[in-house]
């Protein structure tokens, strides 16, 4: 909330007459420390998966009021072109784009998930695209639908026009869960090369975000550069999952060093996933990442502040917490506890300490 400015000129005059100095902190407007769109969240399951219930207006309003200025969402290719490339069902994406536009929250779509007909190995859902051109054509259809001249905006003039200008091409291709055929470097570079051409033909001002890299991400980034990837993306992306807060900054710095070595010192970086799960004592096999809910909240605040303090030096354009809402019920998956909020079994939502930490951090960094 903005601080009230109670007649600062008159108050200063009265203090001057009394021989006292005016207190500038009471009159000063809160100072924004980060650019607009810097604090974001990932709308992961259960609200971001288009095969489920999609995003709800009430939750997106809660995002906006708590300081979320960018929302990363999954656009699953397999949902839009399940049966073949001839036609695209935009229904799941329309719902997401419409809800975000209605609540004036910018989107960063991550486009992934190969339909069976387009896979290298049709029986493996994690298999990569057999032909980059198929993915490129799908990306073109998304720009035609949601870009500056998109058909979605013509059909929904009741909505604020919020065209999508930034697209993230895939997620963690260095992980077999998302790209089964390893090593992935050459095939992934071919994919983003074809997709970027298709996107820019339809929107010359569009920007392409590299897939978020995980683990020893700086090593993976170097491999992408060596495979010729440099000219095919406009933003770097990294997922600095680590046990220690200090290692988050170190991982981001390592990626910046690699980018600089390959001539991309000025290319901006997005931290498209940052998290610690509040899974301590909740899963059968404890992991090094497990934290209590209060630990999770304090790490969130410290990590956002640490990255904000170094955002200019490291070229960090935005940071996304993963995730907005999780179930917090799994006995085997720590990442089911990463949410700022928890979805109860009865369908109601509980705000966790991390939610309030995010909101307070956003108010401070965004000058609210």
Predicted feature locations:
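Secretory targeting and sorting signals
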Residues: 2-27
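Boundary/entry segment of secreted carbohydrate-active catalytic domains
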Residues: 27-69, 74
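Noncatalytic carbohydrate-binding groove/subsite architecture in carbohydrate-active enzymes
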Residues: 34, 50-53, 136, 140-165, ...
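Hydrophobic faces of well-ordered beta-strands that scaffold small-molecule active sites
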Residues: 37-43, 69-73, 107-111, 165-169, ...
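Substrate-binding cleft and catalytic face of glycoside hydrolase catalytic domains
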Residues: 63-216, 225, 229
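Acidic-and-aromatic substrate-binding clefts and catalytic sites of carbohydrate-active enzymes
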Residues: 42-57, 78-91, 117-118, 174-178, ...
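N-terminal low-complexity, Pro/Thr-rich disordered segments
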Residues: 20-32, 239, 368
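Aromatic-rich peripheral "rim/lid" segments of glycoside hydrolase catalytic domains that contact
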Residues: 51, 89, 118, 163, ...
């Amino acid at each position: 909330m903005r601080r009230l400015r109670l007649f600062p000129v008159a108050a200063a005059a009265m203090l001057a007459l009394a021989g006292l100095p005016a207190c500038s902190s009471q009159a000063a407007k809160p100072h924004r420390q980060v650019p607009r769109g810097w604090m974001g969240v990932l709308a992961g399951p259960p609200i971001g998966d288009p095969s489920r219930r999609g995003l709800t207006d009430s939750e997106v309003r809660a995002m906006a009021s708590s300081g979320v200025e960018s929302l990363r969402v999954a656009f699953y290719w397999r949902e839009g072109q399940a049966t073949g490339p001839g036609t695209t069902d935009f229904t799941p994406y329309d719902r997401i784009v419409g809800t975000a536009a209605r609540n004036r929250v910018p989107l960063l779509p991550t486009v992934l998930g190969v339909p069976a007909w387009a896979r290298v190995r049709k029986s493996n859902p994690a298999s990569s695209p057999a032909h980059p051109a198929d993915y490129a054509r799908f990306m073109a259809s998304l720009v035609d639908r949601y870009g500056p001249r998109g058909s979605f905006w013509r059909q929904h003039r009741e909505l604020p026009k919020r065209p999508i200008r930034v697209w993230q091409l895939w997620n963690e291709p260095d992980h077999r869960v998302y790209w089964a055929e390893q090593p992935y470097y050459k095939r992934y570079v071919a994919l983003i090369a074809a997709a970027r051409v298709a996107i820019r033909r339809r929107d010359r001002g569009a920007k392409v975000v590299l897939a978020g890299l995980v683990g020893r991400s700086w090593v993976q980034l170097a491999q992408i550069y060596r495979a010729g990837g440099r000219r095919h993306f406009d933003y770097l992306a990294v997922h600095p999952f680590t046990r220690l807060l200090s290692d988050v900054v170190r991982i981001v710095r390592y990626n910046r060093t690699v980018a600089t070595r390959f001539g991309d010192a000025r290319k901006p970086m997005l931290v498209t996933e940052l998290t610690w799960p509040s899974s301590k004592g909740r899963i059968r096999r404890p992991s090094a990442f497990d934290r209590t809910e209060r630990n999770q909240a304090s790490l969130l605040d410290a990590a956002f502040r640490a990255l904000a303090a170094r955002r200019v030096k490291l070229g960090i354009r935005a940071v996304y917490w993963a995730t907005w809402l999780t179930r917090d019920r799994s006995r085997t998956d720590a990442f089911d506890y990463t949410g700022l909020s928890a979805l109860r079994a009865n369908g109601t939502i509980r705000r966790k300490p991390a939610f309030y930490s995010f909101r307070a951090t956003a108010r401070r960094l965004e000058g609210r």
